[in-house]
């Protein structure tokens, strides 16, 4: 999806930066306090290109991987809002709630809210949510006058960023504008800028011709080279 490659509008970026800046104080105040009131909005979206998603068998079930975050309900004043493409079987939810130490299933359910898009299509969950203003309104209503809240996502792209701005929530994750620095090329650039030793090599190679040239240049600079990792 090409939209995932486009930067957010300036106003959206500014709002997102404002939300993220406030998250630092929120994290320090409530994250490690088991008795602090807080709400976690879980968006378990596998946000990838639709063509790639269509090739992942049972991609919609990947949304169940973040059900481990239901363990947050062991903190008696923590609320969880969990959004999915399709409803999750109640038996699966019961299984997780029965794993909670020292908390009854009834007590946990009072602080757990599930909502679904009822949509099995091959677009990401986050895009499905963004296309449903009424669902966003329902989430906002649950959050209204509630404790401090943030979003927890499987991966963070411009779509999650847009949803965070729509909901007025910070994300426990990396700003998509900084994702490049987490790539192998970005990491090598940082190491070089900081004079950190890193294996000889090249970054930002885009095609087969670039790979061949990089390998040839590596060999020229080190005649004893026997192996290289692409």
Regions found by a protein language model. Give the residues of each.
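ATP-binding N-terminal substructure of ATP-dependent carboxylate-amine bond-forming enzymes
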Residues: 1-189, 209-211
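Active-site nucleotide/adenylate-binding loops and adjacent lid/helix of ATP-dependent enzymes
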Residues: 175-230
């Amino acid at each position: 999806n090409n939209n995932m490659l486009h930067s957010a509008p300036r106003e959206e970026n500014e709002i997102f930066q404002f939300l993220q800046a406030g998250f630092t104080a929120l994290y320090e105040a409530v994250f490690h306090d088991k008795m602090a009131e807080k709400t976690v909005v879980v968006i378990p979206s596998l946000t990838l290109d639709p063509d790639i998603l269509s090739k992942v068998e049972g991609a919609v079930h990947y949304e169940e991987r973040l059900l481990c975050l239901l363990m947050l309900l062991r903190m008696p004043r923590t609320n969880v809002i969990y959004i999915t493409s399709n409803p999750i079987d109640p038996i699966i939810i019961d299984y997780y709630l029965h794993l909670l130490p020292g908390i009854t299933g009834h007590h946990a359910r009072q602080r757990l809210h599930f909502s679904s898009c009822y949509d099995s299509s091959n677009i990401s969950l986050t895009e499905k949510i963004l296309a449903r203003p009424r669902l966003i309104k329902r989430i906002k209503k649950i959050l209204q006058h509630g404790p401090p809240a943030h979003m927890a996502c499987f991966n963070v792209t411009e779509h999650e960023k847009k949803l965070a701005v729509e909901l007025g929530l910070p994300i426990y994750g990396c700003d998509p504008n900084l994702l490049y620095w987490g790539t192998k090329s970005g990491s090598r650039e940082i190491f070089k800028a900081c004079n950190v030793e890193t294996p000889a090599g090249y970054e930002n190679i885009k095609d087969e011709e670039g790979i061949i040239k990089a390998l040839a240049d590596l060999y020229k600079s080190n005649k004893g080279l026997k192996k290289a990792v692409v």
